[in-house]
Amino acid sequence: MNISSIQEQILKLKKEKDVCILAHSYQAHEILEIADYTGDSYKLSVDASKAENKNILMCGVRFMAETCKILSPEKTVYLAQPIAGCSMADQMDKQLISQVKKMYPDYTVVAYINTTAELKTICDVCVTSSSAVKIVNNLDNKNILFIPDCNLGDYVAKQCPDKNIKLLNGGCPIHACVNVEDVKKAKELHPNALVLVHPECTPEVVAMADYVGSTSGIMNYAKKSDAKEFIIGTEISIAEHLQYECPDKNFYGLTLKLICPNMKSTTLVDVYNCLNGNGGEEIKLDDQTITDARKCIDEMIRLG
């Protein structure tokens, strides 16, 4: 079957089986086209909780599907591609952070939403890249342990100078691989383009940007800006999606190194097979994990 034929079958099956399809912004455009909701990980989780469907199919990575299950425990949640993990989320586990917490007993543990459900159970509050600065500023405690992304943590620390923020060595290996030379080369090729980067990039790269923000922030900025050319410093698919949505502007990926293999592991065929009962994986979390992990997400909503 060609792409359009598979898409037609998917649309038919999701209606028959009462499935809401969620697709992260880093997914291929052909997957976004069959999704009920698209966006970043937290937005998709909220969308899932509001959807009337009994079944949720996540086209993204495992921690995103887990977050959907935490926010919608009464629903059946599937991950379209079981091997789609997240290198950042897998860097730190509950055992490690439990030991670190003993070293910093008076610190509030702030966890990027890109963490496992198990790790969320021992954290005080979750944040997204778009809400991190606001939430950290709103915390009563001056002492913060920010996990797992040290680059995002560094960005937050610079925006929150009154806070004492402790960082651990972790983060997104894809965003972290971008260097100053990559930015210089991109600007040489496109001297009139604005540089928009994600705060998961290194501090040196962030310092060279015209705008720093979350995936949704980058997309909104580019759409609303009067500028006509943009260098996009996040997963390469965002430049592709923006080019599709704004054909009167030009978008350039900062570097071809910005390709997330985990996000790219999900295909239309995976979605089709999952809906057919021949693929995917149901996300199962025990009641205690859901209850404990939900606390830091609820705190994020309260402070954000």
Locate the predicted segments by residue:
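Active-site loop-to-helix "anion-binding N-cap" substructures in soluble metabolic enzymes
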Residues: 1-232, 238-304
